[in-house]
Amino acid sequence: QRKLYDWLFALRSKQKVMDQIRLLQPLVHISGRFSAARHYVGVVLPLAWHPRNRNALIVCDLHLDPQVLLEEDAATLRQRLYTRHENLAQGELPVPLKLIHINRCPVVAPLSVLRGEDQQRLNLDMPLYQARALRLSDAQQVWQAKVQAIYAAEEFVPSDDPEQQLYDGFIGDRDRRLCEQ
């Protein structure tokens, strides 16, 4: 238990988290975004760093079929990424992308932490995950631009209403001087 605590405690450092990450090398990720049925455990494949947020890593959840990344265009993927799974049309695959924020103490570890009995207990199909990772690695030219386009698009539109602008972020220098008068 002490080694586990020390490992998790060390992950509060962004540098320690970054030391665990190698693009296109699968790793174990524990997250509340994974369901209790999955024991909150996921095997993910780091695809790329976020184009606008240097603290965010774009990963593919290998539990889900990544074929959708290879077949659909960026606009469709972006729309589907923010659609709840139960609201997807029958036959539509969910987009298996997720962000890991390295400045929020994420729990990540190399695949070597999973023993054979752990893989069985957690119902992890490692050969399937390895095959999916290999397929994505071989098809980088197909999904790379799409993934960047999905996350490069403006996600935040500032409001024109002055009262709502209070929630848009920091007040501009001109407005701050007016407030101080």
What are these regions (language model features)?
Residues 1-181:
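DEDD superfamily 3′-5′ metal-dependent exonuclease/proofreading module
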